[in-house]
Amino acid sequence: MLSAHPEDTLLCVDKLTYAGNLSTLEGAMQHPNFQFFKTDICDRGAIYAIFEAEKPDAVVHFAAESHVDRSIEDPEIFLRTNILGTQVLMDACLKFGTKRFHQVSTDEVYGDLPLDRPDLLFTEETPIRASSPYSASKASADLLVGAYHRTYGLNATISRCSNNYGPYHFPEKLIPLMIANALADKPLPVYGEGLNVRDWLYVEDHCRAIDLILRGGRPGEVYNIGGHNEMRNIDIVRLICEALGKPERLITYVTDRKGHDLRYAIDPTKIHRELGWLPETRFEDGLKKTIDWYLSNRDWWEAIISGEYRDYYERMYKDR
């Protein structure tokens, strides 16, 4: 954002949960127009104090608990952060006159699509049919954003993206998990038979789309953001093995996730038609850039895969 709009001031609010890492922001912290606040978005008093002091013109709401497996294990924190936190931010916008609110959401709110119907895609008109506690919490927040737009006149938009990948991705997610495990010659745990399909979106393409929506999206509208990169999970794992020169015998099939969605696929026609956005990164190119980043930044992720993450990994995969 600062590289594209150096005249803007960027305020970053983050609770720094297990997935937060200040080292990720080292570059931004050097910029004179960047400020960081370690704050829980559910802390109404702290959020109001920031809004009163800084008077932000717009809010882009990325903050969320986002890992499906953790939501299955303990849904409560997902409901608190993803729903109540969204309410607090919107209340702050209304109270302090913030002009724009953008909700960053997920295609998972639509549920899933059958594997044998490649012609079917999620559009903005697809009914919400969440499958997991995570996606239900995001769907609830989306509905709340729509209600605040209609009831209170909040100038709000929503985007629903497909699976992101790229640098700084927390290693509990599929692609960084497989890269980290492969580099350590550890088993590569794949749910079920690995046939579940996801549409992959490079993180920089996602950021470009959000910037366009923030500045040109129509109030009250939903915009789907997809990468046109549908891949089976097992095929991604095999590509990572090939890129790193690791044997496929590291692949270990584990008990499937409860309620595992079969296929996600997004139709991004609306954002292309209205705002001119298209993904620029081919999956093969984005995956190579991602792998190269993890190879060059081992200190960043090796420091993470210890402590709480190690305990979580054992709970998720040890006996499956």
PLM regions and their residue ranges:
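N-terminal Rossmann-like NAD(P)+-binding domain of SDR-like oxidoreductases, especially those catalyzing
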Residues: M1-N164, K289, Y294-N297, A303-R320
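C-terminal substrate-binding subdomain of Rossmann-fold SDR/epimerase-dehydratase oxidoreductases
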Residues: S3, T39, P176, A182-R320
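Short histidine/acidic/glycine/proline-rich micro-motifs that form metal-
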Residues: L16, N163-G166, N196-V197, R257-K258
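Gly/Ser/Thr-rich beta-alpha loop segments that engage phosphate groups in nucleotides
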Residues: L22, Q87, L113, S137, ...
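Residue-level recognition of oxygen-bearing side chains
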Residues: A46, I77, L84, P127, ...
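Conserved active-site helix of classical SDR/Rossmann-fold NAD(P)-dependent CH-OH oxidoreductases
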Residues: T86-Q87, A139-G146, P176-I179, C207-R208, ...
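The catalytic Tyr-centered alpha-helix of NAD(P)H-dependent dehydrogenases
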Residues: P118, A130-S137, P167, P171-I175, ...
